[in-house]
Amino acid sequence: MKLLEERILKDGHILGDNILKVDSFLTHQVDFSLMREIGKVFAEKFAAAGITKVVTIEASGIAPAVFTAEALNVPMIFAKKAKNITMNEGILTAQVYSFTKQVTSTVSIAGKFLSPEDKVLIIDDFLANGQAAKGLIQIIEQAGATVQAIGIVIEKSFQDGRDLLEKAGYPVLSLARLDRFENGQVVFKEADL
């Protein structure tokens, strides 16, 4: 997605060897116009897939997931990283390791929001090692629902997340694919769209 790649080049900041900071438009402050375009692109791509729910993980996946769900006219569910007292029955959980935060969290979704009839599109902000998507897949499958595809805003193609998911049989669509960081600049790999 050319618009997204341009924004990454303009406002993204490389930290170390493998971190891209995009807090000015995705991971802290949200550019709703860009997120709306991202949502439209995902919705157009998956319009024929019969999607009934969009699922993401808090927090930075919420914005692109909301706009995707809006464009598809289906509910969006986000997995919570912390249990609260209102989530006390029928909770579906999985362990998820965060590459950026270097911690493992138990993420959860109330089972009442997913059913075996659901066809789910997972949307997330980044794909690195695939652990967030893998955890969401586990939760979705605990409910008996089907993962139709995984939509990623920014993929770190130099990490093994995509291979892990595709080898497990899940289609992955990434709007921006980072090939590498070179001389303080992002070098893109050809995106899926």
Curated annotation (Swiss-Prot):
Give the keywords, sorted. Cytoplasm, Glycosyltransferase, Purine salvage, Transferase
Task: Cite the CDD domains for this sequence.
Answer: PRTases_typeI
**GO CC list:** cytoplasm
| GO MF entries | xanthine phosphoribosyltransferase activity
Broad class of enzyme this protein falls into: transferase
**One GO term of the biological process aspect:** purine ribonucleoside salvage
Coiled-coil ranges from the UniProt annotation = none
Q: Which reaction does it catalyse?
A: XMP + diphosphate = xanthine + 5-phospho-alpha-D-ribose 1-diphosphate
Entry's localization field: Cytoplasm
This enzyme's EC code(s):
2.4.2.22
Q: Its annotated pathway?
A: Purine metabolism; XMP biosynthesis via salvage pathway; XMP from xanthine: step 1/1
One Pfam entry name = Pribosyltran
Q: Where does 5-phospho-alpha-D-ribose 1-diphosphate bind?
A: 128-132
SUPFAM superfamilies, per database record:
PRTase-like (SSF53271)
Coarse class of the primary localization is cytoplasm
Which InterPro entries does this one have?
A: PRibTrfase_dom, PRTase-like, Pur/Pyrimidine_PRTase, Xanthine_PRibTrfase
* Binding locations of xanthine: 20, 27, 156
Cross-referenced PANTHER family:
HYPOXANTHINE/GUANINE PHOSPHORIBOSYLTRANSFERASE, XANTHINE PHOSPHORIBOSYLTRANSFERASE
Family membership noted in the UniProt record? Belongs to the purine/pyrimidine phosphoribosyltransferase family. Xpt subfamily.
The cross-references to NCBIfam families, in alphabetical order and at most eight, read: PRK09219.1, XPRTase
How does this chain assemble? Homodimer.
**Alphabetized HAMAP family for the sequence:** XPRTase
What is the role of the protein in this entry?
Converts the preformed base xanthine, a product of nucleic acid breakdown, to xanthosine 5'-monophosphate (XMP), so it can be reused for RNA or DNA synthesis.
Q: What is this protein called?
A: Xanthine phosphoribosyltransferase
Gene transcribed to yield this protein = xpt
